[in-house]
């Protein structure tokens, strides 16, 4: 028991360090490309000329594609293990291919830092899980390998989103049946250790998103939250179907990986000429939506362009995560509804923010089929725990409808 406790804490601390180092590497590339270190790719896009804005994501995609293509071409052996930590935990034995995972993470760093509309958390969690896998193979029994990889993945998620409980449930819900409930203890300990470490490294204990404090929802607001869950239940499968169609369209072009990723990048770059907000994973835009939301038409325009950018990035094969882009789409959809509802003052002054947070949780639930994780993650990311009952209700509704329409979640379809 003591041994597991010590290993869990160690994996949590190292995972947080890995996530922090990846973020520092992103800031370093941002300084090289844009002479900025504020971490906002949207601000970087707005500060450069139009031709640079159009070409930078394409060049980043080209560089990442060349890296992946060269590795595949000159690697004379088949991968000894997967590079997907989900696969390693669910159907594998806990091993990850070290060299392939490192190359994939480096390629992700290139596309994320150059503006592609893809999440950075994919590489962060992969690297955390990779360290846990290497450690387990050397110091643990084979029957424990999956457990420690799960600890690394949960700790990476907790570090990236400041959400240790949601990071733990991310493993428990999405990989249901592959881990015994008794094994959840080390996963939670690793995730909490990761949060404490990342707070120490970043010099603060702020939530990921800063929002105004909301009171407990009124009965009519609970109804609207449930209604938004219903809408997300239909929107989630459509979003996943669009991602699958985009991927199929890019593959049908039969391009080499460098050209395929460059094409995805140029689409993002051209869209950014209309709205610079399409650059990056969407974190800064979500923060802006939650604090100073623009008008309905502007939100709608940004949403359409960002959605096309996400489809271009993911469809072209850009390595990265879809968590944060999904949160953005959900926040924008929710804020659109909230802005419309705000025309009726009886629904409350904070209805826009409430709907945006509900949209984030429900679309995440509809795409991951993990309602408890999605609801708890939004609460942890914002500190708005008074919303948890309403978010749980709306997320369960969204997940139920999404499962009925499309039994395969975003993680089963990738």
UniProtKB/Swiss-Prot annotation:
Pfam families cross-referenced by the UniProt entry: Voltage_CLC
InterPro entries: Cl-channel_core, Cl-channel_volt-gated_ClcB, ClC, ClC-type_chloride_channel
GO molecular function: voltage-gated chloride channel activity
Membrane topology reported for the UniProt record: Multi-pass membrane protein
GO biological process, one term: response to acidic pH
Domain of life where this protein originates: Bacteria
Subcellular location: Cell inner membrane
Major localization listed first in the record, in broad terms: membrane
GO cellular component: chloride channel complex; plasma membrane
Keywords: Cell inner membrane, Cell membrane, Chloride, Chloride channel, Ion channel, Ion transport, Membrane, Transmembrane, Transmembrane helix, Transport, Voltage-gated channel
Transmembrane residue ranges: 5-25, 54-74, 116-136, 147-167, 169-189, 220-240, 255-275, 292-312, 327-347, 353-373, 381-401
SUPFAM superfamilies referenced in this protein's UniProt entry, alphabetically: Clc chloride channel (SSF81340)
Family to which this protein belongs: Belongs to the chloride channel (TC 2.A.49) family. ClcB subfamily.
NCBIfam families reported in the protein's UniProt record: PRK01610.1
HAMAP family noted in UniProt: CLC_ClcB
Summary of the function given for this chain in its UniProt record: Probably acts as an electrical shunt for an outwardly-directed proton pump that is linked to amino acid decarboxylation, as part of the extreme acid resistance (XAR) response.
Protein name listed in UniProt: Voltage-gated ClC-type chloride channel ClcB
Originating organism: Yersinia pestis
